[in-house]
Amino acid sequence: MDNTIIITEEATIDNYVSEYDIAVCGYGGAGGSAAIEAANNNSQVILFERASDGGGSTALSSCEMYLGGSGGTSLQNACGFEDSSENMIAYIEASLEGKGDQKKIKLYCENAASHFEWVKSLGVNYKESAHLGRIVVPESNESLLFTGNERVSPFSECAKPIPRGHVPSHEGDFGGKIFFDALKKAISKTKNISVSFDSRVLGLVVDQQNVIVGVSFKKDNIVQHVKVKKGVILTAGGFVMNEEMINKYLSFQTSFGAPYGNAWDKGDGIQIGLAMNANVINMDEAFFGVYFYPPESLTYGIFVNSDGNRFVNEDSYGARIDTIALNKKIKKFIWLFKMRTLSHQFILINFRFWLLQKPSRSSKLRQDLKRVRYHQQ
């Protein structure tokens, strides 16, 4: 599939099909939210979506929004938690290990609580109840949970552990659909927003001073252009489904796992920015997750590498375990635990789960376990 991005000089265009104040490229959670806010601030908005409907990765997600600060969100407060912006900033900066933009982190943390009220104003329902166990997504309808390493050393020494995961109240794992359905409904009721589906943004239109004045897109196999007076917002998602970009930026990680996400995560927005000589950061970062919990009791096993050495604290968030393994170039690790409530033993080898009814009969496993130096916990 051709993903070539083009920058078109305005002088070469015969005509624009329409004119707007703002063009938003990508109709997921970010794009839909940006379109509403722009329209509510007296802008005429065109919202482009490459697929036949909106949603993107947002609609596929659990929609666990990371929110807090400013004394805490209304949900945090209802569950008995107070959260300062300074505390939230300290945790996020520690998690990013110096790779974050401090101004953006501060801006986000100081406004996150108001973001939550905005989401609720769309009609998204949250139950004023917290699940404080170690889970990935709630199995019941609680809406507040821990979704990171807040209770894990060394982060717990940097900031007071506070649950900040806000998920729409439901039983299951489709919070993203709940949020996006509410967002989509709000967009349908918002004046000044036009939506164009099956429209692939090809690039931007610039004038003689290289100022962005429009957007080029293809719809019904016809290349068209719209003029924009205020600006273009790029919300086209990541590049997990673009093999060329994966090989360019994440080649050292391609052997670990398989791409997971929205089929249209082709990196179009990033490529448009690059074509305009914009700066990009952290392109070699990706989300890898090893989720061996729940149940929470599995935390009390140990992870060891092929030399039998423990390399991570097991109460870490699943993505941190995998990231540390990748950074330390650990291509194989073993997970050992004792749990009386299970009649089987689970061993994690080469990032895969193996269910072994009688592990003593596995010669391969016996060889692996002989190399393990047992650590008492």
Where are these regions (language model features)?
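Glycine-rich active-site loop/strand segments that organize a redox cofactor
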Residues: 66-108
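Conserved redox-cofactor binding core of oxidoreductases
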Residues: 107-223, 243-244, 293
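Extreme N-terminal leader/targeting segments of oxidoreductases
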Residues: 1-22, 40-42
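Glycine-rich FAD pyrophosphate-binding loop
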Residues: 40-61
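Glycine-rich loop(s) and the adjacent beta-strand/alpha-helix scaffold that form part
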Residues: 174, 220-222, 227-291
